[in-house]
Amino acid sequence: MANQEQAIFLAKVFIQLKPTVSDPQGQTIHGGLRSLGFESVRSVRAGKYMEISLDEETEAAASRKTTEMCEKLLANSVIEDYRFELEKVE
């Protein structure tokens, strides 16, 4: 089998506390927004966003690696959920 050329993929990773976990940062932001007059804000949940560039042969391989990174390091599966989007960079 011939070697495939590596492509660059951009993984956009979103990590957020699970809905059942208290979010003190989100509560603080919510209070700040309300005190600034943004009375229509009902709630805020804070999270993390990361962009990771990967050299992989296929989108499936990039997806597997991103999942592995999230599960092993980036997200704490006990209290956080994650999702990601992949795009091939030209």
What positions do the PLM features span?
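Long, contiguous binding/interaction regions
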Residues: 1-90
